[in-house]
């Protein structure tokens, strides 16, 4: 039964009006615009009604004005969009515009009417035929509309994070048999898919389209390909969605990607991810684990190495052979904050690798350059990481084999530490950290790194064992060789042609001197070849700075050998070569000044002035000389071939410079200009100048620019260089002193190196497999007033007691406390230098706090002896 409140029902064949007021407010079912589209069809100009329409009886709906009359402006030519008139007309209708959507969501939108500019057809309305309509029949469902997606539309949707706009994407892909990894959905320049695009456009760390995209990729059957699709351009080549999720610090997306099969060993090798010195911006080791470590995300590091899906192998190396530890060393910059997190992450990874892979030590892995993380830290000057590695002390028994520092014994503030010398001092078997620090001149702070314990004490021990004696023997030997060379050159015969006969005793002494000089030249030749071309750390800068004396010795040896060859060949020009060798040989004696602190900085000053200040001065001065010489020589009158005779016609000569200009005038004039620069020249050539005024003007400007300006600038620059070297004289001498020690050690054969090797073989605990952990260690005795011996993992309970251990089946006894050197005291009390064979000095400890402690006074023995240890 019909409700009495219902409005009048339309007659069959009429269009029912919706209930409500005349203004068209919504009170019933809205008139769909898709049905309105059926009203317009036919050709242009067909405006008459059909016979059926003309003959139908009038109904209640006929009181409504004609549609063409109400839309008379919408059917005219030039009106682009009839929907504007539809929205602005006063026609009482319930047609409501649909919600506005993005322009690239689909090609058709219910609730709106779009008129494409290319479609210029005029429409006429179509008469709606009378259809019997059941009052309770459900409204017909609109036909399903298939949206169209392309790369711009898809990238715009994921950038906005709109999941609703992704409705229909799966149907579109399945219908057209497409996938999200197809080329049409990739960025042409980079090969980027929509997943990295979504990860790069997060809002508060989230983008709701990411799970939807992964679900669609799973349903289309290319989940792994979609997740692991890398960038393909040269700039970001190899980067995947997992790299981006880690860089954006989104652990939830990292977990989601790994759970769906992301490659945890994908390598980002693009130019952007290269070191700065190679044109890159941020090098992190290419691998996702290295990226998480280098961006200080320990929670992601733990997940990548311990997740149940696919664990990241911590031993994996990148294209440079670097592990995650190498990558951490590479990003260190010696600042406090950076060093703190790098060292903490370094220990976390090292200990984790030891627990996951007990048979492997991540710290011993070498990269393509043959460098371990410790060597890399030394070569790049990362002093914070370097000091942390060599002084690392692990107290946990399970991972104590990773320690490089062990406390042998402790008593109060005094403790004796054993430092592992592996990689630090290798006795020539392989590249050592000590050689890298000394011979690599690219390290600006290497003098600071040489002061780090145990490097500092290791150098002192080498100097005491063999360095000092060998150095002074070399000094005496070289001076004797140069004296012999000088006497041999001074007493060379002046008559006859070489080789000269040997008849008298003086001649035989000269022969002995020549043989000794030739042998020393050959010896220097081969040793210089070994040092220059077989050095472990070669380089042009290292050659001219650190290896300058080796280069000079090489030139000296070549001159000596060439001079001897010319002498034996009977060429008198051997004398010219010999005198150059003689001068260079005496200049090379400056090398031995580095053994003394008072004279060690002079050679450095000379090197810096020669290669820095004097080189720049000579470059500018040479340009000035050539320019002024060319101009002044041009002003001289050319010489003629006519002879000029005296008044009595007795002395006739052809005029030459300085009276005129001939072919050799330019070179002679350069020498005269140099004399003017140092204030020794004359003006004899002025009389032969064509324009004397111009000639004098040029000479005056030359003297002002060179003698007054350039020379004084050179003096000022040299004074500044000397001042800088003097400020750093201690560090510079320490570096030269270390270079001298290593030069002496490298000149020894292998068996002598091992005989003079510093340190001792010590059992420091148990290795990972339970066997005794025996290492070559170096002992450093230290004093620290700010940290006391509580809960220390010491080896010996009795301070200073001898330890007897077995080594290759033989019994060896370690010496007692060999060096009672108190260093690193905070505050520093005193520094002791051990004198071999004598008692140690008294250490005054008065006025260091309250002498009474716990009701009694604690004191120290008046003398601290190596034989009477402990205290």
UniProtKB/Swiss-Prot annotation:
One of the protein's GO biological processes: positive regulation of macrophage chemotaxis
PTM text: N-glycosylated.
Region (Disordered): 1-68, 110-143
Positions carrying Phosphotyrosine: 110, 253, 805
CDD domains: TRPV4
Gene Ontology CC annotations of this record: adherens junction; apical plasma membrane; cell surface; cilium; cortical actin cytoskeleton; filopodium; focal adhesion; growth cone
Keywords for the protein's UniProt record, in alphabetical order: ANK repeat, ATP-binding, Calcium, Calcium channel, Calcium transport, Calmodulin-binding, Cell junction, Cell membrane, Cell projection, Cilium, Glycoprotein, Ion channel, Ion transport, Lipid-binding, Membrane, Metal-binding, Nucleotide-binding, Phosphoprotein, Repeat, Transmembrane, Transmembrane helix, Transport
Extracellular side: 491-507, 569-572, 637-665, 686-693
GO terms of molecular function: actin binding; actin filament binding; alpha-tubulin binding; ATP binding; beta-tubulin binding; calcium channel activity; calmodulin binding; identical protein binding
Residue ranges that the UniProt entry lists as topological domain Cytoplasmic: 1-469, 535-547, 594-608, 723-871
Main location: membrane
Residues carrying Phosphoserine: 824
Region feature Interaction with calmodulin and ITPR3, mapped onto this chain: 812-831
Tissue occurrence: Expressed lung, spleen, kidney, testis, fat, and at very low levels in trigeminal ganglia.
Residues at which Ca(2+) binds: 682
Listed transmembrane segments: 470-490, 508-534, 548-568, 573-593, 609-636, 694-722
Catalytic function, reaction form: Ca(2+)(in) = Ca(2+)(out)
Family from the record: Belongs to the transient receptor (TC 1.A.4) family. TrpV subfamily. TRPV4 sub-subfamily.
Quaternary data: Homotetramer. Interacts with calmodulin. Interacts with MAP7 and Src family Tyr protein kinases LYN, SRC, FYN, HCK, LCK and YES. Interacts with CTNNB1. The TRPV4 and CTNNB1 complex can interact with CDH1. Part of a complex containing MLC1, AQP4, HEPACAM and ATP1B1. Interacts with PACSIN1, PACSIN2 and PACSIN3 (via SH3 domain). Interacts with ITPR3. Interacts with AQP5; the interaction is probably indirect and regulates TRPV4 activation by hypotonicity. Interacts with ANO1. Interacts (via C-terminus) with PKD2 (via C-terminus).
Record note on domains: The ANK repeat region mediates interaction with Ca(2+)-calmodulin and ATP binding. The ANK repeat region mediates interaction with phosphatidylinositol-4,5-bisphosphate and related phosphatidylinositides.
Protein name in the entry: Transient receptor potential cation channel subfamily V member 4
């Amino acid at each position: 039964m019909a409700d009495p409140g219902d409005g009048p029902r339309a007659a069959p064949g009429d269009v029912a009006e919706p209930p409500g007021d005349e203004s068209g407010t919504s009170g019933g079912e809205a008139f769909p615009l898709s049905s309105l589209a059926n009203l317009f069809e036919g050709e242009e100009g067909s405006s008459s009604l059909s016979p059926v329409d003309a003959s139908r009886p009038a109904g209640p709906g006929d009181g409504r004005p004609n549609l063409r009359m109400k839309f008379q402006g919408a059917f005219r030519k030039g009106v682009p969009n009839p929907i504007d008139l539809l929205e602005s007309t006063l026609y009482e209708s319930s047609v409501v515009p649909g919600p506005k959507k993005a322009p690239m969501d689909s090609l058709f939108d219910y609730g709106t009417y779009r008129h494409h500019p290319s479609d210029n057809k005029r429409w006429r309305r179509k008469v709606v035929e009378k259809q019997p309509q059941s009052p309770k029949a459900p409204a017909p469902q609109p036909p399903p509309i298939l949206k169209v997606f392309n790369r711009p539309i898809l990238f715009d949707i994921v950038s906005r994070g709109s999941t609703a706009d992704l409705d229909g994407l799966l149907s579109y892909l399945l219908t057209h048999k497409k996938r999200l990894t197809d080329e049409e959905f990739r960025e042409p320049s980079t090969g980027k898919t929509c997943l990295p695009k979504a990860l790069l456009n997060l809002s508060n760390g989230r983008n709701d389209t990411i799970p939807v995209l992964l679900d669609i990729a799973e349903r289309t059957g290319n989940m792994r390909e979609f997740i692991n699709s890398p960038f393909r351009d040269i700039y970001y080549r190899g980067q995947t969605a997992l790299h981006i999720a880690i860089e954006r610090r989104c652990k939830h997306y990292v977990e989601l990607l790994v759970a769906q099969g992301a490659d945890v060993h994908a390598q980002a090798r693009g130019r952007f991810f290269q070191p700065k010195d190679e044109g890159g911006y941020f090098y992190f080791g290419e691998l996702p684990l290295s990226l998480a470590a280098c961006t200080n995300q320990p929670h992601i590091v733990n997940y990548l190495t311990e997740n149940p899906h696919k664990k990241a192998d911590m031993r994996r190396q990148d294209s440079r052979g670097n592990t995650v530890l190498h990558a951490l060393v590479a990003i260190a910059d010696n600042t406090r904050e950076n060093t703190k997190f790098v060292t903490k992450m370094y220990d976390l990874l090292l200990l984790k690798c030891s627990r996951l892979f007990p048979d492997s030590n991540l710290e011993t892995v070498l990269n393509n350059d043959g460098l371990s993380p410790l060597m890399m830290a030394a070569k790049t000057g990362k002093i914070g990481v370097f000091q942390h590695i060599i002084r690392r002390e692990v107290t946990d028994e399970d991972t104590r084999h990773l320690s490089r520092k062990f406390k042998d014994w402790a008593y109060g503030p005094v403790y004796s530490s054993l430092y592992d010398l592996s990689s630090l001092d290798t006795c020539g078997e392989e590249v050592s950290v000590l050689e890298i620090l000394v011979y690599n001149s690219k390290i600006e702070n290497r003098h600071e790194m040489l002061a780090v314990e145990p490097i500092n004490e290791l150098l002192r021990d080498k100097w005491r064992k063999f360095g000092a004696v060998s150095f002074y023997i070399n000094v005496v030997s070289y001076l004797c060789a140069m004296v012999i060379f000088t006497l041999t050159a001074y007493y060379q015969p002046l008559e006859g042609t070489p080789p000269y006969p040997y008849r008298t005793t003086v001649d035989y002494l000269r022969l002995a001197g020549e043989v000794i000089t030739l042998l020393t030249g050959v010896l220097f030749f081969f040793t210089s070849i070994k040092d220059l071309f077989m050095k472990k750390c070669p380089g042009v800068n290292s050659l001219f700075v650190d290896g300058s004396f080796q280069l000079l010795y090489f030139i000296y040896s070549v001159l000596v050998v060439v001079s001897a060859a010319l002498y034996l060949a009977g060429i008198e020009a051997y004398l010219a070569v010999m005198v150059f060798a003689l001068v260079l040989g005496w200049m090379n004696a400056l090398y031995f000044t580095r053994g003394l602190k008072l004279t060690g900085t002079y050679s450095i000053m000379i090197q810096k002035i020669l290669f820095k200040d004097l080189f720049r001065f000579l470059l500018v001065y040479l340009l000035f000389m050539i320019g002024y010489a060319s101009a002044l020589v041009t002003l001289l009158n050319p010489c003629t071939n006519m002879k000029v005779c005296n008044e009595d016609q007795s002395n006739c000569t052809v005029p030459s410079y300085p009276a005129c200009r001939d072919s050799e005038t330019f070179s002679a004039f350069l020498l005269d200009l140099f004399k003017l620069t140092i204030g020794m020249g004359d003006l004899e050539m002025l009389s032969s100048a064509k324009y004397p005024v111009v000639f004098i003007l040029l000479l005056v400007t030359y003297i002002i620019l060179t003698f007054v300006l350039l020379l004084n600038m050179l003096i000022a620059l040299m004074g500044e260089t000397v001042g800088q070297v003097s400020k750093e004289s201690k560090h510079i001498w320490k570096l030269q002193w270390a270079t001298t020690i290593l030069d002496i050690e490298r000149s020894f054969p292998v068996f002598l190196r091992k005989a003079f090797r510093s340190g001792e073989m010590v059992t420091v605990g148990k290795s990972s497999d339970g066997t005794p952990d025996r290492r070559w260690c170096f002992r450093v005795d230290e004093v620290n007033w700010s940290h006391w011996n509580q809960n220390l993992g010491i080896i010996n309970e009795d301070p200073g007691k001898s330890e007897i251990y077995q080594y290759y089946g033989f019994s060896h006894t370690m010496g007692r406390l060999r060096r009672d050197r108190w260093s690193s005291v905070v505050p520093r009390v005193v520094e002791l230098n051990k004198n071999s064979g004598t008692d140690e000095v008294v250490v005054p400890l008065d006025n260091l706090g309250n002498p009474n402690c716990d009701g009694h006074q604690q004191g120290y023995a008046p003398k601290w002896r190596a034989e009477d240890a402990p205290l």
